[in-house]
């Protein structure tokens, strides 16, 4: 459902931000 999609999107966003910070 929507909640599962939001959880998945949040995890992807966190991974993207974390890797972006690590690359700096």
Curated annotation (Swiss-Prot):
Localization terms from the record: Secreted
Entry keyword set: Amphibian defense peptide, Antibiotic, Antimicrobial, Secreted
Keyword field contains Chaperone: no
Tissue localization of expression: Expressed by the skin glands.
Name of the protein this chain belongs to: Ascaphin-5
An example Gene Ontology CC term for this record: extracellular region
GO biological process: defense response to Gram-negative bacterium
UniProt keyword annotation of Secreted present: yes
Sequence similarity: Belongs to the ascaphin family.
Biological source species: Ascaphus truei
Function, in words: Antimicrobial peptide. Synthetic peptide shows higher potency against Gram-negative bacteria than against Gram-positive bacteria. Has a very week hemolytic activity.
Main location: secreted
């Amino acid at each position: 459902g929507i909640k599962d999609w939001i959880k998945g999107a949040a995890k992807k966003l966190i991974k993207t931000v974390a890797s972006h910070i690590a690359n700096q």
